[in-house]
């Protein structure tokens, strides 16, 4: 299913190719959490990010679909109580925040790590900073490939995920390895390229 622009960091714009979007986190709900679960972990990532940025958002060029791809983390939340059954639309993110959200809202007791916009905007005077919590899709506007965004909820046997501070999605993936009791996954697609369907 296509991810609505409401949940995107960038939306298509005919004049500038892309502009900032509403950047609201989507509503997510779940059930059937295993009785043995001690905490939940939420990870959202784009599995189609170009591994080279040479052609990204460059006028007169395209990012070829054949280019190798990597994961880009958009949201990592740990220590969600196993009794929580939903996160409301916009409850954790509502708008683009230059230099990143520092203390994003979330379920009581949950902690949110930095997303990969922290790296993407590194060195940018206007946007550089630490981006905690959810920030939505903003694939290259000239990418030939439709991007896939995976929202993954993990039920774990960990009372507290062993990550601290400005933790990353990759660190959380490593920390929960061997501790996952159940997994639920929802995948959506998004593009800023009008020629990609």
Model-derived segments and spans:
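N-terminus-centered regions that define maturation/targeting leaders and the start
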Residues: 1-197
């Amino acid at each position: 299913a296509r991810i609505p622009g409401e949940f995107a960091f960038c939306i298509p714009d005919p004049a500038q190719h892309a502009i900032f979007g509403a950047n609201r986190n989507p509503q997510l709900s779940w059930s059937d959490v295993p009785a043995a679960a001690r905490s939940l972990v939420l990870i959202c990532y784009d599995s189609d990010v170009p591994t080279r940025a040479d052609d990204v958002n460059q006028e007169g060029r395209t990012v070829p679909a054949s280019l190798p791809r990597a994961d880009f983390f958009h949201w990592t939340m740990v220590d969600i109580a196993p009794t929580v059954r939903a996160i409301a639309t916009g409850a954790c993110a509502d708008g683009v925040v230059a230099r990143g959200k520092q203390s994003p809202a979330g379920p009581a007791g949950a902690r949110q790590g930095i997303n990969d916009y922290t790296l993407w905007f590194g060195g940018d005077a206007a946007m550089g900073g630490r981006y905690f919590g959810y920030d939505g899709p903003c694939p290259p506007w000239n990418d030939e490939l439709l991007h896939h965004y995976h929202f993954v909820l993990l039920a774990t046997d960990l009372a507290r995920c062993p990550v601290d501070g400005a933790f990353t999605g990759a660190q959380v993936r490593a920390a929960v390895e061997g501790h996952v009791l159940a997994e639920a996954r929802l995948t959506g697609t998004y593009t800023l390229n009008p020629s990609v369907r």
